[in-house]
Amino acid sequence: MEIQWYPGHMAKAKRLLQSQLSKVDLVIELCDARLPLSSRNPALNELVRHKRRILLLCKADLAENGKTQEWLAYFKSRGVDAMAYDATPARTKQGKAFIATAAQSVVERGERRGMNKTVRAMVIGVPNVGKSTFINRLYGGSVTETGDRPGVTKSNRWVKVTPYLEVLDTPGMLWPKLNDQRAATRLAYIGTIRDAVYNQEELCVSLLEDLMTLRPTETMQRYKIKNADAKGYELLEEVCRGRGFLMRGGVLDMDRACSVVLDEFRAGKVGKLTLETAPKEEKPHAPETV
């Protein structure tokens, strides 16, 4: 199964994003804490590399705390200012302070000129990483449309979230060619890629195999899997029988099983799980930001 997804609105959004860069003081990049490396768009990274940037590891409540700390240390070693974030009030307060610190130099520059500078920040990231939810939390209400699916935001939009901070909500963007298919599969696990793009049964089988490697006890208990040695489609059949996903005549309801497994994983019901391990840095790396 090969996964590729780069619809026309993403290419258009990238061009619009480029046209807005000159107006931006700060870039706020969001990635998924469960996939801190694979959920960062290398094309966007190149596009904004000359801008002051901070990184938020979103949905941190769904990731393993210890591994999130390892990722934060890794990004720090690369000169990236990063913090773990989720949509709770406490984290939102920390996020506001984090942005304020990053924007301080812009504010001070305006004060030296006798101006009350409004900081303009661009929010970027892959689809369904939580950009619109993040902006709504900053604003303190529903100012942008959200949804638990990729592709909700289709155009760039400036939103004034405080008297001194204006943010640009941008559509989630992938890159034209997903060469690393292992990463593409994991992006599909977390809902970055539209469901219609891939074979749901193949994706679910792959996820179940990963869960049996990473969380065998929890996975077997949740889905009532009796055969610990089951592989491939045998796992999906075990889920159907264990959870009672049967149609008339005892036919296994594979579609329902796939939907449930994917939905429950994305909601964190199998437990906190980080799908990537932070690389070990042997020597200091050149900073990503300027």
Language-model features and meaning:
Residues L44-E46, L72, Y139:
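Short, solvent-exposed amphipathic alpha-helical segments in soluble enzyme
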Residues R52-I54, D61-G125, V143, F245:
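Canonical P-loop GTPase G-domain recognition
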Residues A121-G140, T144, T170:
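Glycine-rich phosphate-binding P-loop
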Residues V106-G114, N136, S142-D148, L214-T219:
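Short, structured loop/turn "capping" segments at alpha-beta junctions
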Residues M1-V27, A33-R53, A60, G66, ...:
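Helix-rich effector regions associated with P-loop NTPase G domains
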